[in-house]
Amino acid sequence: MAGTTSIEKSEILSRLLDKEGIKHNVLNAKNHEKEAEIIAQAGKFGAVTVATNMAGRGTDIMLGGNAEFLAKNDLKKAGFTPDLIAEATGFAETDNETILKARKMFSDAEDKYRKELAPEADKVREAGGLFILGTERHESRRIDNQLRGRSGRQGDPGESRFYLCMEDDIMRLFGTERMQKMMETLKIDDDTPIDAKILSGAIENAQKKVESKNFQARKNTLEYDDM
């Protein structure tokens, strides 16, 4: 999964992938009606997903595919209403025959899909799990951490790596001269990862500056509204 900081950048990356003939899905606010389906497929072997960092948050990406989503989709295709599907996936006690029938159908379908998806889930785990590629650092550390947290869920393997450029918004606005000089001194090619604490610390300081600036702007707005 490749995380971007805006819809515009997710679409630019999507066009570049199209140009290279790489099949992928795009998850952003423009595609919200397909969000559940894209998230459900994002953990399949070989799946490539481009997402804005906030899109689909709160939904775990299941390695191999999401059996629960596929089972719910079966109920939808069978003509069950959204309210009945919600009841079918719930646990409240009931003697309503329609709900009980829907629950039985959902349970059977979920078990079937879990068995079907298990070999693919193992294949994804053996390959290292979900790989998160951050195309740049967000101005908020919290959002960066949410993107990182999409991989390695529930004991599954996973990895995340952010790729930075001195022309990224946060680096351009708050990247220090010291950082620029350090990059020039190291003379490392673009394919070599840099895991230096001094670089991580400089980026974190830049994010703190942005967060502080945004907080002050919100505070000033509230004070103005209270006048």
Question: Predicted segments — roles?
Answer:
Residues M1-L13:
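Conserved strand-helix element at the start of the C-terminal RecA-like helicase core
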Residues K208-M227:
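C-terminal accessory/connector segments of nucleic-acid motor ATPases
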Residues D18-N214:
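Conserved phosphate-handling catalytic cores of large alpha/beta enzymes
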Residues T5-I7, L199-I203, E223-M227:
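A glycine-rich phosphate-binding loop feature that marks nucleotide/adenosyl-phosphate handling sites
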Residues M1-T4, I194, K219-E223:
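Short acidic, glycine/proline-enriched loop segments that cap or flank alpha-helices
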